[in-house]
C-alpha cells in the first residue's frame, strides 16, 4: 500500500544518507 511505499522510500533515503556519511568518515 501507500504506507509501505513511503516506508520503503524513507529506508532508501536513510540508506543513501548513511552511505554518504560513511564515505566522509
From Swiss-Prot:
Residue positions where Leucine amide is found in the record: 25
Principal cellular location given in the protein's record: secreted
Signal peptide: none
Gene Ontology cellular-component terms listed: extracellular region
Expression sites by tissue: Expressed by the skin glands.
Tree of life domain: Eukaryota
UniProtKB keywords: Amidation, Amphibian defense peptide, Antibiotic, Antimicrobial, Secreted
GO BP annotations, alphabetical order: defense response to bacterium
Cellular localization per UniProt: Secreted
Recorded family membership: Belongs to the frog skin active peptide (FSAP) family. Ocellatin subfamily.
Protein's job: Antibacterial peptide that inhibits reference strains of both Gram-negative bacteria (E.coli, E.cloacae, K.pneumoniae, P.aeruginosa) and Gram-positive bacteria (S.aureus, S.epidermidis, E.faecalis, Streptococcus group B) with relatively low potencies (MIC=25-200 uM). The peptide shows very low hemolytic activity against human erythrocytes. Wheel projection demonstrates the amphipathicity of the alpha-helices is low which may explain the low antibacterial potency.
Name of the protein: Ocellatin-P1
Source organism of this protein record: Leptodactylus pentadactylus
Amino acid at each position: 500500500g501507500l504506507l509501505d511505499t513511503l516506508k520503503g522510500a524513507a529506508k532508501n533515503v536513510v540508506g543513501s544518507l548513511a552511505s554518504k556519511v560513511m564515505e566522509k568518515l
